[in-house]
Swiss-Prot record:
Component of the proteasome core, a large protease complex with broad specificity involved in protein degradation. GO terms for biological process: proteasomal protein catabolic process; ubiquitin-dependent protein catabolic process. InterPro entries: Ntn_hydrolases_N, Proteasome_alpha, Proteasome_alpha-type, Proteasome_asu_arc, Proteasome_asu_N, Proteasome_sua/b. This is Proteasome subunit alpha. The keyword Magnesium does not apply. Keywords: Cytoplasm, Proteasome. The gene is psmA. The keyword Electron transport does not apply. GO terms for cellular component: cytoplasm; proteasome core complex, alpha-subunit complex. The formation of the proteasomal ATPase PAN-20S proteasome complex, via the docking of the C-termini of PAN into the intersubunit pockets in the alpha-rings, triggers opening of the gate for substrate entry. Interconversion between the open-gate and close-gate conformations leads to a dynamic regulation of the 20S proteasome proteolysis activity. It comes from the Archaea. One of its GO terms (molecular function) is threonine-type endopeptidase activity. It holds the Pfam family Proteasome_A_N. Belongs to the peptidase T1A family.
Amino acid sequence: MQMAPQMGYDRAITVFSPDGRLFQVEYAREAVKRGTTAVGIKAADGVVLLVDKRITSRLVEAESIEKIFQIDDHIGAATSGLVADARSLVDRARVEAQVNRVSYDEPIGVEVISKKICDHKQTYTQYGGVRPYGTALLIAGVDDNLPRLFETDPSGALLEYKATAIGAGRNAVVEVFEAEYRQDMNMDAAILLGMDALYRAAEGKFDASTLEVGIVSLQDKKFRKLVPEEVENYVQQILEKHKETENKE
């Protein structure tokens, strides 16, 4: 029986394949691609995070599923991939943020915390006896009156975006953003754009109970999650928009 080309190279995290690939890292990325769709958008007056929690059973309490987390007063994170891995990284980020406050008496920078998380992820691609984190994070916040949005990859790679998505619906969401995103839009418009993209990615199968929204405003530099009533208001606007479009057709 002929062995597959990657046999022997996909078992150990520290072994490169002949064409320079780390298969375990690629498999970790696949875990993210199968996760819930998370969206981040920079606006003129802040930054927005949205997640479609994709409830798979009507018996599950939607409130028990959390995909957007507060890291510090001015920083939030949205996750996709393995839930337990994400929770571990969020806890680590929170500790790093508090250590920075105690050590330097100032809030940690969004880019700094993102790099620390990526540095930690990278070590789990380099040593034997461990596996990569099967999760990606979108880290959003405000630095020096500027909105910041970073994506942390399972490999430890770090990229800053104006708008992006992770998870199962990434390609569909990014396609919407490339066509409709504007840097001068406010947070209201950014939330509506993000929800519209999630609506299209889910082919209309979403409602307020499955959506989580977090924002950081330039005005107060505080992270907060929208309450269900606020989310419902935005959802109704999206549903009405698509209903009008269908009626015209």
